[in-house]
Amino acid sequence: MKNRLLILTICLIATIKMMAQEFTLHGKVVDENNQPLEFAIVSVASQGKTAVTSLKGDYSLKLHSADSVVVKFSYIGFKTKTKVLRRPRGKQTLQVVLREASTTLDEVNIKGEKIQSDQIQELKTKDMKMTPSANGNGVESLVQQQAGVSTHNELSSQYNVRGGAFDENSVYINNVEVFRPFLVRSGQQEGLSVINPYMVDKIGFSTGGYAAKYGDKMSSALDITYKTLKAKSKKPVVEGSLAASLLGADAYIGLGTQKLSWLNSVRYKTTSYLLGSMETKGEYKPNYLDYQTYLSYQPNKRWKLDFIGYISDNHYNFEPEDRETKFGTMENVKSFRVYFDGQEKDRFLTYFGTLGITRQFTANTSLSLLGSAFYTKEQEKYDIQGQYWLDETETSENLGVGTYFEHARNYLTARVMSAKLMLKHKVKKHQMEAAVSLKREHIEENSVEYEMRDSAGYSIPHNGKDLYMVYSLKARNELNANRMEAYIQDTYRFSGGTADSTGNRQTHYTLNYGIRMSHWNFNRETIVSPRLSLAIIPANHENTTLRFAAGLYYQAPFFKELRDTSTVNGITIASLNEKIKSQRSIHFIAGYDYRFKLGDQRYKFSAEAYYKALGNLVPYSVSNVKVVYYGQNECSGHAAGLDFKLYGEFVPGTDSWLSLSLMDTKMKLGGKSIPLPTDQRYAVNLFFTDYFPGSKKWRMSLKLAFADGLPFAAPHRELETNSFRATAYRRADIGMSYQLLDNSHREKKTFLKNVMLGVDCLNLFGIDNVNSYYWVTDVTGQQYAVPNYLTGRQLNARILLEF
């Protein structure tokens, strides 16, 4: 009996001692306005414990006591806060206030990790600063590296998403949709993107299943938010930068007071140095210049005024001289030589402006009136004659000699004005948004194009009088239309299940549902688009998120899709088809996110499966970046695939990722099933950053792309003849940068905050990627597809000054 009593006493003492070594930490995480922050991360690295705050900002952790316990609180867009508990016992309560992180230049300083709870993924812009890029458009280059996104032209900022065309991607800046030039047909003509990376605060991007607020496009949504500078005292905040490279120069300056934020940027780009590496030699004179300003004025907590102004003047002048291209197989190499006369002169002038007034009625309710105006005047003019020779390389046998002449006088003017009334209201677990907008569209086009060759494209005996017109088009059109759009959506965040003893083990749900409607008086069509998405963070699996989305998406027709053609006496006439209907895509998406740590580095693995049922499609062909539509709803189809992405700190303090995309697309046209023109069966992208051992002043950035080639056929043929596929797109860009000065962490500040030097090797392995094909016919009538290659290996030097 005494032995039993002794054993019981020892066990009781041991239990009490063990209980004394544990304690419970609970509390709440809020922002500066005392609003709860849901899904904030509370972690104790020394004990490997992590908790995610509830919808009310509450958290609870069971921890082991020690002399000191370090607790870290982090949330996307907010400064990370660390608290140290000294010999904690029993129950500890800790309420933490997180403050918004300041932003500098084009960098979003984020230490925490946001849990994706919808179909919009947030991209960090800090890696754009010294990343190698041939097109100079940092945001689009970042988007092109994402899973499900592809590009086959390093000179272009355009991209395809899950089998969609370039025109199926919507872009918003501060809740206002922006437009791209209409007449651009090649990456060489493209200038600077309207998105200015120096002004960007947040980037949201979705490859499908996005909410009702994101317009009538059926492939992707890119949501850009510009930053504002705010002084903490009466002393103004000033920041700026100067950047220069062999491809252009940029200047940026920002001013912030307690009420006013004013950002300004001037950018200049020239690609003549880069284009000099192409096979077509000549005098390239591309010059692109733009200016952008963003003014935000908030006199008090109730009112806010925002203005964005943008002017862009892009010139592309080109006088070709000659080219020589070798193509074919190792056993059968052919040579294609051309000597040119003539020139091309293009100009793209664009004005864009937005004005927004916001009334904040309460902390949870606001009403905004947004107005915007877009104007573009574009001209494309060229007269180019080429005399070509097609030869067998080994035997020197001449397969064809000919002359061709290409002529174009294309003029287009477009004006789009819009007004939008937007209401946002938050009540308990609901975050609602509704808007109605009116658009006025006016477009005028006057185009003449033709191409002719002697002797039907090859040299044979003839009477000297006949010229064969390969292609001839005339278009004189005017569009005047009004478009009305409206949407309403709600984001409902709630928790389910029974909480455990910590009060924190519940399943978290984020449900977004909404409906969108629009009417266009040109074709008198009304479309309605319901959309739904759900994200689940399971109890006891807080590092896992399951995502599901479905919705009906329409591609509302605009000017390009309207152009229908008819041929009379060998001349093709383009007119606007008033009977055209919106293309339709039904999205079904299932996604999986898993967050984990290896050592001290954070990683995230994401996977998505999708299926898109396509209907009312308007067939189109792609040459370079020019998309030509058939102008009629003629086919249906599908796109299905898998996207994988591994993201994290492969090297401490840096962000890197690897993505893999697998896809299958088909459309049924003329009773035949064929791939979509953007069918890319596989794509692999790698973005990797690293520091030199022992020094963070030296940094390396590497971009790798390996993607399947796209289907193609001879020009001016039916799409059913798309029986060929281009070679795979393979490219590697590497950049090395050295931080000459880093004054950001010094107590005594100087005028210059950061100085960085860099050198890039673009197309590191010198791979000849095919952009498009030029078709030549020999004396036997056999056609040859002569590849038009993109840029070769080239070096670029850069310098960046920040103050």
Outline where the language-model segments fall.
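Gram-negative outer-membrane beta-barrel transporters
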Residues: 493-496, 610-613, 630-713
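Transmembrane beta-barrel wall of Gram-negative outer-membrane proteins
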Residues: 238-268, 281-319, 344-369, 373
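C-terminal beta-signal and adjacent terminal beta-strands/loops
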Residues: 653-656, 705-713, 738-803
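Short, acidic, small-residue-rich periplasmic hinge/interaction motif at the N-terminus
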Residues: 30-33, 40-45, 72-79, 88-132, ...
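Membrane-embedded beta-barrel scaffold of Gram-negative outer-membrane proteins
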Residues: 366-372, 579-633, 638, 757-762, ...
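Surface-exposed extracellular loop regions of Gram-negative outer-membrane beta-barrel proteins
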Residues: 273, 321-326, 539-588, 609-629, ...
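Periplasmic N-terminal accessory/gating domains of Gram-negative outer-membrane beta-barrel systems
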Residues: 79, 86, 92, 115-169, ...
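Face-selective signature of the C-terminal outer-membrane beta-barrel domain
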Residues: 298-314, 343-523, 606-609, 657
